[in-house]
Every structure is written in C-alpha cells, then in structure tokens.
Amino acid sequence: NKLILGCSSTIIPQDIETIGEFAFSHCRNLQKIIVPEGVSCIAGGAFEYCSSLKDVVLPTTLESFIGGSNFGYCTSLESITIPKGVCNMESDIFCGCISLQKISVDSANETFDSRNNCNAVIDTEQNKLVAGCKGTVVVDGIKSISSRAFYKSGITSVHIPSSVELIEPTAFKDCEYCMSITVEENNRTYKSAGSNSVVEKATNELVLACTTTKIFPEVK
C-alpha cells in the first residue's frame, strides 16, 4: 500500500507501507507529520518544500529513504530523529534545510550513528559522514564526507579533523552561510593555514571555499 498524494490535513492510514515520491511536496501549511508504524519506505521528495514543517515523527518500522531530497527545503525543520531500522538514505535527504540544527540516530541502529552528539548521520562501518546540517560537528574519527552531505545547509563554520581522508565533490555545495573553514594541522590530506578554505596537500587543489576565503598563491 502506497500513499501517492497527501495534504496539510492528511492523517496517514495505518495500512500504508510506502510514502510515494513528492506525496506531500509543496504542502506549505503542513506543520507536523506523524508517519505511522508499518511504513517502511519514504520516497524521494516526499516532504520536499514543506516550508512550515517543524515536527516529524518517524516509525520504528522505517527502513529506507530512497530517491533523495526526502525532506528537501523544509526550511522550518529544526530537529529530527532517525529510527533504529533505517539502513538506506541519500546524502541530500536534508538539502536546503537551513534551520536544521539537530540530527540524532537511534542508538540501536546498526547501520548509522550520530556519535558524540555530532548532529549528523554517520555510516558506522565506513566512518563516513552521510548527511549533515547547520549544527553538525565533524568529529574526529570521520574518514570521509559524502557528496552533497551539506548541500544548501545552513552551516556557518566547518572544521575538518585530522582523521578525514576524503571530502567528496559537492559535499559542501552552495553552503552560502558558511564563513569559517579550518583544518586540523596534522591532517595528512588537507590543509587550511588560516585561509578559510580546504586545500588538498598533494595537488594544491582548492577543495572547499567560502565567502571569506583567501586563496594560496600556490593553489592550482
């Protein structure tokens, strides 16, 4: 059973298993959604552009976010909890959620975690930051950051710890509020040196910049 279209007054029936693509997209008056037990999948763009959405309750039966931008541009959303059964999501699940400050993952989840209150979704096995937000701290132990993990987020400052070995292209794409970027001095892959940027040491390639960036003369 798949819900294909909803509105701000919809109460999702108990027998629904999937929230379809763009089912609630552009429901600008939707402020709260309770996804009932039994739902296992939320498809791409399901709640995209629900600009008033502040309160999201997800079921323990949820397993997958597919298609990306599931909560894209929910500009009023400030916090969300990922249930224990979720084992699949795209990195741009929260793209454009400029107010999102807190992301927590149920401690019983075997695929993802939000270690040390980092306010991000981490792939536990790969130590990969999958999805972040305005309030994310990239904690030590993270080895890589996914493409589009912070796409159009409200993040204002970024610190790359020594453990990060790979920042995928577009990981911080269109982060227009970001004003400060630093890299741990003993990071083997990247450097910053007070330039408000991330530069790959081996190639001198500018990987990440912001409005306050000073570009090294040696940057290629």
List the model feature ranges, each with a label:
Residues N1-T18, R28-C41, C50-S64, C74-N88, ...:
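Structural signature of tandem-repeat unit edges
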Residues A23, E125-K128:
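A short, hydrophobic secondary-structure junction motif
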Residues G20-A23, A43-A46, G68-N70, S91-I93, ...:
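Consensus positions within tandem repeat domains that build extended binding/scaffold surfaces
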